[in-house]
A protein has these predicted regions:
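Conserved HGGG/HGGXW glycine-rich cap/lid loop of the alpha/beta-hydrolase fold
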Residues: 1-30
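Conserved catalytic-core motifs of eukaryotic protein kinase domains, centered on the activation segment
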Residues: 6-7, 31-37, 98-99
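Conserved hydrolase catalytic core segment
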Residues: 59-97
Length: 178
C-alpha cells in the first residue's frame, strides 16, 4: 500500500538507467484523505491509471505487492501498451473459489462496529508491520512511526479498515465489480 516499504530497494536501482515512481495508495499516504466508501478496487485502479497516463510512461516494469498487485496491474490493463514487464509479490488477482479469510484479523474487521473498535481504537496495524513484512530487525521504531504517520496523524484509520475489508474472502468479494 506504500512505496515506502521498498525504499531500500529503490535506493539501489541505477538511477541513470531507470526512473523510479513509487505511488502510495490514494488516501493512505500524505495525499488528501478520501471517504471510506471511495476505497474500492475500481476507484484505485482508475486513479493509478490516470497518474500513469499523465506521466506519459512507456516500457514500464511494474513491481507491485499486496494491494499493489490488483490495483497496479488493473491500472496497466487499461493501458497495456505501457507495460514491458512485471514483478509481483504477496498479492492476489482472482477471488478465492471457496469462502476463506486471509487472517483472523481480516475476519474480525469485517464485522461492523467490532472492526471500527479494533482498527480505530485498539489495534495499530503499523505496529505489526515488523512482524509480518520481511525481516523484523529491519523495522526500527522510527521507521514504523514514519510508515504510519500519514494515516495516524490525520485520524484516517477508516482507510486502513476499508482496505482490510476489501480483501477477497470468497467467490464474490465486495471489492470486485463485475
Amino acid at each position: 500500500t506504500s512505496g515506502f516499504l521498498y525504499r531500500k530497494v529503490a535506493e539501489r536501482l541505477p538511477r541513470d538507467r531507470v526512473r523510479v515512481i513509487m505511488p502510495t495508495t490514494v488516501g493512505l499516504g500524505f495525499s488528501s484523505k478520501i471517504p471510506a466508501s471511495d476505497h474500492t478496487l475500481n476507484n484505485h485502479i482508475g486513479w493509478i491509471n490516470t497518474v500513469l497516463k499523465e506521466l506519459e510512461l512507456n516500457e514500464v516494469i511494474y513491481a507491485g505487492q499486496d494491494w499493489g498487485g490488483p490495483i497496479g496491474m488493473g491500472a496497466l490493463s487499461l493501458s497495456p501498451e505501457m507495460l514491458k514487464g512485471a514483478v509481483l509479490m504477496n498479492t492476489v488477482f482472482n477471488a478465492p473459489k471457496e469462502k476463506a479469510d486471509l487472517t483472523t484479523m481480516h475476519a474480525r474487521v469485517k464485522t461492523p462496529i467490532l472492526g471500527e473498535l479494533l482498527v480505530e481504537l485498539l489495534f495499530n496495524p503499523f505496529e505489526q508491520l515488523a512482524r509480518v513484512q520481511g525481516d523484523p530487525s529491519s523495522w526500527s521504531d522510527d521507521v514504523i512511526r514514519l510508515y504510519g504517520k500519514p494515516v495516524l496523524e490525520s485520524g484516517n484509520s477508516k482507510a486502513i479498515l476499508s482496505m482490510m475489508r476489501m480483501v477477497p474472502d470468497g467467490p464474490d468479494p465486495v471489492s470486485y465489480t463485475h
